[in-house]
């Protein structure tokens, strides 16, 4: 691809980003990313987060979901966040930087969570996209499998799970896997999710344990 094409594409993305009403509203309300409106819409419909809950936020940076979760769980609750990228501190959030695919990072994350179980696992993780669907989709599915495995390790009975998933190869099998583990499973496409994106959010409640 030529440099001019890349520049034109980048320019369109930047214009779309800065004209985006969700970007503008996030800035106005003091949130770190437009992604906050995705979890807010899920919360308004499904009421996953309640005062006093313990929440794990995977793929947390830059911190929009963690910011929102802290507001919902309050001073009696706890938010434990993890990301391979750095994240500026948020009051009430215990943040661990690292790749939890690595055993040492996973152990450190589990140490922060245990001995208590958690009420909600949420994941907005996505791989760095190459533009090659044959490469990107397996990477994305690998991450959502890791998030589901985290549920198996730390989620309390009747706990909840929400995860960003890209529709494509492996999606139907993954959805069935989630349905086997939870009593109620819904698929959400938040208004703030760009229409052209293949992303949807699986919202699962009533973990069978």
From Swiss-Prot:
Its EC number is 2.1.1.166. S-adenosyl-L-methionine binds at residues 63, 65, 83, 99, 124. Its main location: cytoplasm. It comes from the Bacteria. Gene3D superfamilies: Vaccinia Virus protein VP39. GO terms for molecular function: rRNA (uridine-2'-O-)-methyltransferase activity. InterPro entries: RNA_methyltr_RlmE, RNA_MeTrfase_FtsJ_dom, rRNA-MeTfrase_E, SAM-dependent_MTases_sf. This is Ribosomal RNA large subunit methyltransferase E. It comes from Aliivibrio fischeri (strain MJ11) (Vibrio fischeri).
